[in-house]
Amino acid sequence: MYQEEIIKASKKIFNEFSDTCLQISDNKFFFQPAEKWSIAQNVDHITRSVKTTRLAYSLPKIVIRTLFGKANHPSITYEELVSKYKLKLEQGGKASGRYLPKTILSKKLFLIQKWQKENEKYLEAIELKWNDDLLDHYIAPHPLLGKLTLRELCYFTIYHTEHHLNIIKVRLTDQFN
């Protein structure tokens, strides 16, 4: 995917995620199933993920290169990144540390607006500071996948959002029907 396509795909999944969450009643949104995250906690997790990811696109390029180095491999495709992530999940990979959602005390609209603001900042940073060549040149660490090119990190963000959207849709179907 080129930068323009990444931005388009990101906006599409971000909007679908927001629209889905906005349609959920507060009771369902905050319902805490045993051993699982509530929908609100999924939103919090995704917001934390995008906020942290955004840093890689917001910092000066020299800082990114100094901290993490340069890519020593071409970017893999979106499909390859998704397969790699699914394999890590199958092997027991899961969120930890700063990516774990907190107990949610905020209002639904506040959480969704916070998510939307982080998305806007993330997309703005990519659009204004990164072209296709640069997305393949720089790398950043991912807690499960290791060092990714910034293009691969964009792919991850798209798929990660879709992954949690699917979790939410399944939860709505399975638990509330």
Q: Predicted segment positions?
A:
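Charged, low-complexity, helix/coiled-coil-prone segments
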Residues: 19-21, 53-71, 97-114
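Alpha-helical packing segments of well-folded alpha/beta enzyme cores
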Residues: 6-9, 13, 17, 49, ...
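Short, contiguous alpha-helical
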Residues: 28-83, 124-177
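Acidic/histidine-rich alpha-helical segments that form the ligand environment
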Residues: 75-133
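A short small-residue
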Residues: 26-27, 95-103, 139-144
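An N-terminal domain-cap segment
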Residues: 1-36
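Mixed-charge, polar/low-complexity N-terminal
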Residues: 3, 9-11, 17-18, 120, ...
